[in-house]
Swiss-Prot record:
InterPro entries: AlgH-like. It comes from the Bacteria. It holds the Pfam family DUF179. Belongs to the UPF0301 (AlgH) family. This is UPF0301 protein BceJ2315_30870.
Length: 192
C-alpha cells in the first residue's frame, strides 16, 4: 500500500487516450485534469466540440450574448458525467471571484456557476476559456488502474493547447509534448 506522499498527483496534466482505449467515449480524446486526489479524479475533454455554440447555449439559459467574436465558439463535450451541467475552464480574471470556482495548480480555474457566463456575456469575464457540458470522473484508484493498463498517457498540460490550438489539432499537439505522434502509437501493450 502506498503512502500518501508516494501518490502521484495528476492535477494540471493532460490525459491522452491510447489507441487501445476500451471506452469509445474517450477514444481519441485529450482530457485536462482539474482535480486528482485519493478520492478520485475530475477532468474535462478539451477536443470534442459539439454542434452547440455559445450563442445557442446562452439563449437556452436566458443570457444575452452580443459579443460577435464569441457567438459561434463551440461548446465542448466535457465527458459523460453531468452532461446537462456547464463547466468553464478559464484563466483567472484579476479581481473577479465566481461562486463555484476551483483553482487548478498551474494557474487555471474551473467554474461551474452561471456568474462566470454572465461575466463573459458582458465582456468582463475571462478572455480565454473553454466551456463544456459534462465532465469526466473517476472513483478512487480507477484512473490509476486505467493508466497502469496503458489506457492513457500523461503529460504536463499546456494552456496554449487548451485555448490557442484548434480542437482538431489538440490530440497531436498534446502528444507532441511527449515528443511522439499518433503514428508512433500502438494499440498493443507489450513487455520486453
Amino acid at each position: 500500500m502506498s503512502k500518501p506522499s508516494d501518490r502521484i498527483n495528476l492535477t494540471n496534466q493532460f490525459l491522452i487516450a491510447m489507441p487501445n482505449m476500451a471506452d469509445p467515449t474517450f477514444s481519441g480524446t485529450v482530457v485536462y485534469l482539474c482535480d486528482h486526489s485519493e478520492r478520485g479524479a475530475l477532468g474535462l475533454v478539451i477536443n470534442r466540440p459539439t454542434d452547440i455554440d455559445l450563442e445557442s447555449l446562452f439563449n437556452r439559459i436566458d443570457l444575452k450574448l452580443d459579443i460577435e467574436p464569441l457567438l459561434h465558439i463551440p461548446v465542448y463535450f466535457g465527458g459523460p458525467v453531468q452532461t446537462e451541467r456547464g463547466f468553464v475552464l478559464h484563466e483567472p480574471v484579476e479581481g473577479a471571484s465566481y461562486n463555484s470556482s476551483m483553482s487548478v495548480d498551474g494557474g487555471l480555474e474551473m467554474t461551474t456557476s452561471k456568474d462566470v457566463l454572465e461575466a463573459v456575456a458582458t465582456g468582463t469575464g475571462p478572455k480565454r476559456f473553454l466551456l463544456t457540458l459534462g465532465h469526466a470522473g473517476w472513483g478512487a484508484g480507477q484512473l490509476e488502474e486505467e493508466i497502469s493498463r496503458n489506457g492513457w498517457l500523461t503529460v504536463a498540460a499546456d494552456p496554449r493547447i487548451v485555448f490557442d490550438t484548434p480542437a482538431e489539432e489538440r490530440f497531436e499537439a498534446a502528444l507532441g509534448l511527449l515528443g511522439v505522434s499518433s503514428s508512433m502509437l500502438s494499440g498493443e501493450a507489450g513487455h520486453a
